[in-house]
């Protein structure tokens, strides 16, 4: 079996741990691999200042400042971190929804005594037959059919 063989099948906690381990190993793999040689980043040229003695603000041949474009080398890493964050958040939400649904289902099965769902106006309470004469009286709830 895989690395999650010690966890019960279908365990949301196990799935979260497996996802976390995958993310950590994925980041370590990227950190260990040498960075690939990327082509020179495209740059946008903006005028630094107008030439002395020139009336126009954008003179041809003016010294230009280079500004890196919107694409940065950290964009894939940031995008990957965002995807991991969204996936982990979705897994946590799904875990809590499933856990809530399971506890509600168990409560319906195990609840023997509680508030009756029927209208109390239609109930007829009669004492149960007992040999003891105690202060506690138990009543049998029967719906009267009128």
From Swiss-Prot:
Residues that carry a glycan: 55
Region Disordered, annotated ranges: 43-75, 125-146
Signal peptide: 1-30
Keywords noted in UniProt: Glycoprotein, Membrane, Signal, Transmembrane, Transmembrane helix
Main location: membrane
All ranges on the Cytoplasmic side of the membrane: 102-146
Extracellular side: 31-80
Topology within the bilayer: Single-pass type I membrane protein
Residue spans of biased composition, Acidic residues class: 129-138
Transmembrane regions listed in the UniProt entry: 81-101
Cellular component GO terms held in the UniProt record: membrane
Subcellular location: Membrane
Recorded family membership: Belongs to the FAM174 family.
Name recorded for this polypeptide: Membrane protein FAM174
Organism: Xenopus tropicalis (Western clawed frog)
